[in-house]
Structure formats: structure tokens, C-alpha cells
């Protein structure tokens, strides 16, 4: 049951500050794309680009790990943020997380996994002993393969918010 709970919860990625990362000994972030960085219509905000630049400028490594099989979509976001990426990761399976960890050359506890889904991002990161950060979805609109899980995730998020 512990695997479904994140180490931290924020309304969005912009709330994740360098002071929080330093306090928690996080040297890198593994980022989800859909509804974490971009909305349903594939828009990446200037604020997120700026946030990414600021954190990278302060030594935080970043890497995209996405379940989408649409390489071009992930590649476009990665180029704008100037970070490496892996797509079609099959989260919550461990393989993609371990591959990124190896490339980052860091211990799992020094890597933060940031995503909007408990059943992929959070469980996957927790299974790999990484520091997990749950954020609310950027957009209310979801793809069909995500939408069915949201009511369950919303109940869990309510419990997480109570504990905050």
C-alpha cells in the first residue's frame, strides 16, 4: 500500500523549488510529459520552460520518461527544455526508470520522479526507491486510457492532501 503514496505533493511542477530539492538531496528529476508538462493539446507553457532552465542552471539534471508511443511529441518537449528523453516507457515497470538512473549516474534516492498519475509515475518511482512527487494534472481533459483511473486517483489524492 505504501507504494501508491508519493513522498511529496504539489499543485504543479512550478511549485517544485530548488530549496525543496536541496533539502531532500535530489540532484535530478525524471519528468512525465502528458498532463505533467503539457496539456491535452500538447502546449508547453513558457513558465515551465523558464522553471526548467532555472533548475538546470542550479545544477539539477532533468530527463523525460513518458509512456506515450508518440516519439515526436516527447522529442518536441525535450528539445524545448534541452533535456534527454525516453518514450514508450511502460511505467510503472522498472526498466525505464533504471535506464534513466544509469544515464544520470545517480543513486535512486537522489532522483525525483515527477508525474500526475499515481498508478504509473508514483508507483514506478517508488518501486525503484526514488523520491516521488505527485502533481495535479495540467489539464482537466484526459486521454481515454487515463480517464478511467482518475476517480480512484482523486480519492487517493484527497487522503494525501489531508496528511499534508
Predicted regions and their residues:
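Asp-based, Mg2+/Mn2+-dependent phosphohydrolase catalytic module
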Residues: 2-31, 42-43, 50-61, 65, ...
